[in-house]
Amino acid sequence: MDPQTTLSGADKDRLYQAAEMLLEARRTLQPLDDLPATLRPKTLEEAYWVQDVMLEALGTLGGWKVGAPTPEATPLYAPMRLGTFAGSGDRIATQYCRMRGVEAEIAFLMGKDLPPRSTPYTRQEVVEAIASCHPAIELLESALLDPDAADRLTSIADLQSNAGFVPGAAVEGWRNFAFADESAQMKVDGFIRVTGGKNAAGGDLLRLVVWLANDAQGRTGGLRAGQWITTGSWTGKILADSGSVAVARFPRFGEVTVRFG
């Protein structure tokens, strides 16, 4: 948890209760309309604190999801659990799935540590610390019946609906490619659900990674070699069914597949 966040004992009790309600809703596949008003996070910092409590209960950190609604907006981020990662083509057990949401994304694998420091990392330093770039599918589940209708901070606290991560093969020459020139397609069971999708960050995906390395270091403890950073949806949330096969395809970056068994 972020050492810079100071919460009272009463606040911690309230947020622990919120985290437990979200965890129970995910475990039982019995979604909530929202948290009770008395338990909802009141600030973004409180929402992130709930995320950290949920991560502690669910398992080991494998990386971070980070995104922004516009090229100028301050990014939002959430931890991704290593135990929910899968390989392209793998089958996801559906007894733990309710939404079966999928999003096409582009992700980076860190090759070097970027520990916290007072001097901000430059863009070049961050790029040099990245080992590889990959197409990816983020898997989405939620403790909330409709995350878009619930309180915004509750939705953020609920790991921003993250439920898994599926990277594809590494892309050669990615450092010389303009992400703004790329687009994405999502197929489910052979039918194109979205085509021509663009990233909300305006193509500058590396801005998000640089921000994560610098502005979020008090909470993340720095970025570490072996962690994955996925940088937001190109297709929006697409819902699949039990038995579905979802394929995210990028013209330049290739494709990645996930199956719901």
Q: Where would I find each of the regions flagged by the language model?
A:
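Catalytic-core "active-site belt" of small-molecule-metabolizing enzymes
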Residues: 5-204, 242-245, 255-261
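Juxtamembrane/interface motifs at transmembrane-helix termini
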Residues: 215, 245-246
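A conserved acidic, glycine/proline-rich C-terminal tail/linker
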Residues: 208-238
